[in-house]
Amino acid sequence: KNPEADYESSIYRLADGRCAIPATAFKAALVGAVRHFDGLTMVQAKAALFVSPEEGTDLVPIVGTPHMREDMVRLESGVADIRYRAGFWPWSATLKVTFLPHMLDVSSVFALVDAAGLGGVGEWRPSAPKSASGSYGMFRVVG
C-alpha cells in the first residue's frame, strides 16, 4: 500500500488544482432527499433538477483544505482493510441548481438542498447504501 498515493488519488481536482466533487454526487443527494417530501417522485426530480458543474468539467469546486483520513473498511470477502482518503473539514461549495419552475419553486429547492445535506456526498456519508453510519459529506444551506 502507498497511503500518500491512495490519498491523492481520492481527490477530484480541477485543471487549476482546486479540489472538487462531481456534480452528479450533489444531484444524487437532491434526488434521494425527495423521498422526504410529498408531491414529487424521485423519477420526476431526476428530470426536474440539474446541478451545474464548473464550465468544461463535471465537477463542482469545493473550498477546504484536504487532510488524510485513515478509514477501516470491510471488503466484500469480510476481511478488514485500511483506506487512505481525503477528508475536508470545514468545507463549502456553491451549488448552481437549475430546476423546472412548473414542478418546483425556489423555496422548495432550498428545502430540498438542505434535506440533501443530511444525507451528504462522498465516502462514508449518512445516506451511503452500504454504510449508513457515516457522518462525512454533510452540508446545509447558508446565507
Where are these regions (language model features)?
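RNA-interacting cores
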Residues: K1-G143
